Amino acid sequence: MQHTLTRTASLPERSSSAHSAATALPALRRPPDSCETLVPLLCIFWFVFVSMSPLPPARANKSDNKGLISADRNNKATLLLTIPRCTSKSYTNDLSPLKMTLLSAGKHPRPFRQEHRC
């Protein structure tokens, strides 16, 4: 079955020039430039009200502190963490690790490793 295209009387004939084709077709009605005026208004709103708004006031609380974490000075368990090591008090010496010394039972202690001479 062969289909043929026929022109109807309601459509105007197309011509070779673009100008005459545009004038021959009925003009489509668009909404009155609502999209073209809305975008610049949104840009102006963003610039004026959002980017130019003042920064929120600085809050002084412990959750905003991004620096070094310091121990609570009222807590005796963490008090040692706040004292510099060179100026520590005498009671911190009790908590420091003990130095171990090795004692030998004989006159000549055995070496830990065998000495290999070449």
UniProtKB/Swiss-Prot annotation:
TM helices/strands, residue ranges: 38-58
A Gene Ontology cellular-component term: membrane
Localization per record: Membrane
Span list, region Disordered: 1-26
Bilayer topology term: Single-pass membrane protein
Domain of life from the UniProt record: Eukaryota
Biased composition (Polar residues): 1-20
Keywords annotated in UniProt: Membrane, Transmembrane, Transmembrane helix
Function statement: Overexpression confers resistance to the antimicrobial peptide MiAMP1.
Protein's name in the database: Protein YLR162W
